């Protein structure tokens, strides 16, 4: 009997068992959502009295607490009327970012990353992630202040090749346009059901909701319309055509009444046209070509027709400009295919983002 061989074999078995146990323990760990806040200079002293202290939900992967390594970062932007709780607040299993990230890491679908979810709602329901003379400089806050804050406080890989920006609806608009403007900060972008605003679909002067929005003289009248399109028109106007001298909305509306009909008001209307990503693509072609990866998608039964129409137009424009991108239509509406282990966030967005990070 070879006792030495038996002892060595026993040690190998023990070592293998130890390594297996360590691996299982590692995979059994979960990430965590931490709450944080940032005092923003870009959002201080606004006409609409927005809160300059912005709340954040931040997903830290399992390995964050267990190591000293640095991680790539995804900035994830919410839609109009929502906050970061769109992604972090649901307690239903696999209906929140933490559950999906933890599941994907264990399944080796993607690896660990930090996800930053800021609250960029405004008093009129949404910033559209743009600089506004009325609600504040949300583009500067997101792309400059917030990124610097996260890189300073958390163990990030602080370079564009390890940063992505994605979002849903209004957040999809923000993700695509901020990446378009700041390829030195973000290298990957993904817009889910992106609310690419255009004068198409519901956003036309023959829509009764548009007429109601144009006629509304105060917040009470606006909310009484009970129309997301009517309210949304004013929300977008605070982003695209703000006017600090015109209370109570502090906007130039893109339409005006001419008799009983709404017609374009040229100055404000043209500002909206210039803020349409289809038009922006021409101006930012060089920047778009610097991005490593661009993707956007939509449910072909989206309740908002302007989203369907303008996402298709945006893809055609990028194709015409020879800008590499992925555009996908799927069977679904504005929200019903986002969540769960069979949903778009888990199977498409998170995987796409991680696969395109600089390794």
Task: Label every model-predicted segment.
Residues 1-31:
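Bacterial Sec-dependent N-terminal signal peptides
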Residues 29-359:
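Non-catalytic cap/lid and distal C-terminal segments of serine-dependent acyl enzymes
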